[in-house]
UniProtKB/Swiss-Prot annotation:
Domain of life, source organism: Bacteria
PANTHER family to which the protein is assigned, alphabetical: DNA REPLICATION AND REPAIR PROTEIN RECF
Name assigned to this protein: DNA replication and repair protein RecF
Pfam families to which the protein is assigned, alphabetical: SMC_N (PF02463)
Binding site residues for ATP: G30, A31, N32, G33, S34, G35, K36, T37
Stated role: The RecF protein is involved in DNA metabolism; it is required for DNA replication and normal SOS inducibility. RecF binds preferentially to single-stranded, linear DNA. It also seems to bind ATP.
Length: 360
């Protein structure tokens, strides 16, 4: 879904934003603190139901306002989100209220590329697992169903472990069965997708880091040779002592291995940034191969990447048919890249929360 229209109300310092005629590349420039990143934040809120800067709605809803609203339109769809300061939200697709955020996310596959962040590599398994599951959600039709049932069983089992001290295997049996059943399904799905993803990843890695050999290695979170049920049975007493479930797909990881060790241990900060970009580009490529359009948020392109990396990234996103919303302090460099690559774009000036169309 590519956006032709975007409306934003009461997000941070932004005045009422009404953008029309959006292009494949949409560039927002202005001083620090002008509100550039808040535009990306609003699009992220629409697609995911949350900000990438804070978990607290009051922090991005304007002072003394009760809500924030983001609306977008494509050639075929209209989607909208009202986020209340309480955290509640109202979502609509083509005028009809929808019950889950997943319905918006399916329509608006969204990748956020922040060249300044190395969180996916440096901050443990969770962000890597989330990266993998973003791809799963968009390319594996049965994943969301299996994950919902697995998560429900995990929550119930953990509640028992936390609230009851004299648990028997019989008490845990119904949740063990459900966890084992859906956990094995999730493992099989993830394993298959990682194998496919690795092909796309190697292609983008060779363009950004041609001198490095890195493999995606999926760690399932349990001992696959004996199965998840056996792990749950063997560990039930320790789980009672820990008061949570140790083994299962919720503990999975996506390891990035080089010839010299794990990426987080051996790569420089600059290499880590390019590696993360390669991971996300390869996911976009996999969706593109399935005829799915991705919207990409690219924050502060020129801050951390050299000119060659900037141009390679812009060119690759254009090849993949992505619609890009990017921020920059250096509009001259970005304009040159876009002109050199003959890419259609729209330029917007952002000043004290006011967004206006600028001359290309």
């Amino acid at each position: 879904m590519h956006l032709t229209r975007l409306n934003i109300e009461r997000v941070r310092n932004l005045k009422t934003v009404a953008l029309h005629g959006l292009q494949p590349f949409n560039v927002f420039y202005g001083a620090n603190g002008s509100g550039k990143t808040s535009i990306l934040e609003a699009i992220h809120l629409l697609a995911t139901g949350r900000s990438f800067r804070t978990h607290i709605p009051k922090n991005y809803i304007q002072y003394e306002a009760d809500d924030a609203i983001v609306f977008a339109q494509s050639a075929t769809e209209k989607i909208g989100m009202q986020k209340l300061a309480s955290g509640e939200q109202l979502m609509k697709v083509n005028g009809d209220t929808v019950a889950t955020q997943g319905q918006l996310a399916k329509l608006l596959p969204l990748q956020h590329i922040d060249p300044q962040s190395t969180e996916i590599i440096d901050h443990g398994a969770k962000p890597r697992r989330q990266l993998l599951d973003w791809l799963m959600f968009h390319v594996e039709p049965e994943f969301y169903f299996a994950w919902q049932y697995y998560s429900r069983a995990l929550k119930q089992r953990n509640t028992l472990l936390k609230t009851r001290r004299n648990l028997s295997l019989a008490d845990l049996e119904p949740w063990n069965k459900m966890l084992s059943n859906y956990g094995e399904i999730l493992h099989s799905q993830r394993l298959s997708i990682v194998e496919q993803w690795n092909v796309y990843f190697q292609n983008d890695l060779s363009q950004l880091l041609p001198d490095l050999e890195i493999e995606l290695e999926y760690s399932p979170g349990f001992h696959t040779e004996q199965g998840l049920m056996q792990d749950l049975l063997n560990q039930h007493q320790k789980d009672i002592e820990r008061r949570y479930t140790e083994y299962g797909p919720h503990r999975a990881d996506l390891r990035l291995k080089t010839l010299f060790g794990h990426a987080d241990d051996v790569l420089s900060r600059g290499q880590k940034k390019l590696l993360i970009i390669a991971l996300k580009l390869s996911q976009i490529a996999m969706l593109h191969a399935s005829n799915k359009e991705t919207v990409v948020l690219l924050d502060d392109l020129t801050a951390e990447l050299d000119l060659t990396a900037q141009q390679r990234l812009i060119e690759r996103l254009s090849q993949l048919g992505s619609q890009v919303f990017m921020t920059t302090l250096d509009r001259a460099s970005v304009k040159k890249h876009l002109h050199d690559l003959s890419i259609s774009y729209q330029l917007f000036s952002v000043e004290s929360g006011q967004v206006s169309l600028a001359a290309p």
